[in-house]
Amino acid sequence: MSEKPTSIKLVVVGDGAVGKTCLLISYSIRKFPEDYIPTVFDNYVVSLTAGTRQIQLALWDTAGQEEYDQLRPLSYSSASIFLICFSVTSSVSYDNVITKWHPEVIHFAPKVPIILVGTKLDTRNDPAIVKRLTEQGMTVINTAKGEELKNRIKAVKYIECSAKTSENLKTVFDEAVKTVLMNKPQQRSKCALL
């Protein structure tokens, strides 16, 4: 008899347009979506194997826009892990991890592990983006600042990735599954022989 798959609920939060939906779509169907469509709520389920365990990874996408602040926390129930995302080319989204996303997550799910994700890694060295940021008196977020933020919010990991190029994309989800499995007791059969 085969074991029931382990269910993991992964919830992704962060500002609108930081790449949360692209992260999930690129991972789940291995194709980067070229069009931006703001999310209200979406879920995807990915079946995978971790060692000998079958995993049902439920990916919950959330809307980052302010008008969904009252609705979004409804998706936090029974979360196994959170990905708090910011764009490495947006200091506003980086700052909002501290002022909005981390406080919201720990308010509704204080014991659930968090992985901090720096998205849009492929744009960090884009000359046009760097020039635009410089003209606005801003800079890209480097890895050291990401690690500093990880420590500040006590996230278990900080990972930078690109949904567009797939750089470190699989790593984000592998680390999320690994984190949950390390903290989740092995389910045992409820059958006993006397």
Swiss-Prot record:
Subcellular location: Cell membrane; Cytoplasm, Cytoskeleton; Cytoplasm
Listed GO biological process terms: actin filament organization; cortical cytoskeleton organization; establishment or maintenance of cell polarity; regulation of actin cytoskeleton organization; regulation of cell shape; signal transduction; small GTPase-mediated signal transduction
Motif stretch (Switch 2): 61-79
Record has Transcription as a keyword: no
Highest taxon above the source species: Eukaryota
Gene3D superfamilies the UniProt entry points to: P-loop containing nucleotide triphosphate hydrolases
GO molecular function term, any single one: metal ion binding
Positions of GTP binding: 17, 19-22, 34, 36, 39, 64, 120, 122, 163-164
InterPro entries in UniProt: P-loop_NTPase (IPR027417), Small_GTP-bd (IPR005225), Small_GTPase (IPR001806), Small_GTPase_Rho (IPR003578)
Positions of S-geranylgeranyl cysteine lipidation: 191
Protein name: Rho-related protein racC
